[in-house]
Amino acid sequence: CSMWDAIYDCLFFCINQDIYDSLTPEQQQVVDEAGQKAVEYERYINRSGDEEIMSRWEKSNGVTFTKKEDMDIDSFKKAVDGIDDWFVNELKSAGYDDAQDLVDLFTEDSVDTVEDYSDLNWPETTWNFACSTTETSTWADGGRKFGELMEKATGGKVKVNIYAADQLTNGNQSEGIQALMNGDPVQISMHSNLIYSAFDPRFNVVSLPFIYDSYDDADAKFDGEAGDKLKEILNGYGLHCMGIAENGFRELTNSKHEVKSVDDMKNLKVRVAGSNLLMECYKRWGADATNMNWSETYTALQQNTVEGEENPLPAIDAASVQEVQPYCSMWDAIYDCLFFCINQDVYDALTPEQQAVVDECGQKAVEYERYINRSSDDEIKARWADKNGVTFTEKADMDIDSFKEAVDGVDEWFVQELKDQGYDDGQDLVDLFTK
């Protein structure tokens, strides 16, 4: 038996879509949670049996095992060099035009691979990952990717449990961040800058309106000097930021009518994230803005307590909000990021070499989350339009200037708000994101 680890296959654990759709969103969340736990259990028992099987085969059947390190693996790799290109052409010939994107997801070093660092004397430990959104969200997927990479890098010594919807703090997002700062019961989390603003209003700078031209522009800022400044602030709260992931452009949905100009926003009851900056922006746009936990929003929209909300499409989709929101304005007005952090004490307990591995896995998970978050928009829009009858108003069909004019000067308002609260670096922060 040659233990070469050349080819892998997975198991899709699926439920019929019609059966799933017949459940309430709350019931769907329970099904997803139970399903993910069953998947994690199956992975564990599948992987943990190899050593026992090998020992039994040797004793009972006289099987000779050839380990990977004793094989000329490069000779096998060279023999199949270029098979990725063959596969892409095969798919294209069959009419599948997304083949290269699929291959890139599984083969790019930035997404799915990490070296074996199991010789670094890792402690056997389990870290709890928390995020505000559901099990099926890109946030949770980012946490799962980090867990997969860490388990692979450490030879299974470090494992990561996923707790979506801030389960460990009863759905309270701010308490989820506080639990991370305490290091118990959360050691790792992915939370929005808007939620962090409850602890430090400077994090609102990320979400000043209309300051990003594109996703590339956002990446350049978060991977550059602006992102470094945010990481420095996080460090002051006992957190080490492994990378800055993405919630994305917060599109506006509502149940009343199309929103094309600022006049359409007048008195619209909109749930916004817990941020003074967002509240100020929506006030200037004429909306009746209110704050509530994301976990409470679907019911509030269903009962018409609020008429609209604003979030990136993947986050809206993961919570099935499109079921009660027939209008969506794709205005790209406000963007928010996700801080992918580990408790500083947990991080400091590692050796410098181990810390480097954690940072590598963290950055790969961030890049993965960004990719899947962005690549899903077109599919989501097509499905919402077909299945839920959602009407989309594109940015090109909106009077964007009317929205910009309404929030003209909000940068200066924000800097003054920070000064009033004792933060003198507000203008420098704004300049990092707007110059």
Residue locations for each model-derived region?
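N-terminal secretory/targeting leader peptides
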Residues: 1-217, 229-435
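Signature of the catalytic double-stranded beta-helix
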Residues: 222-228
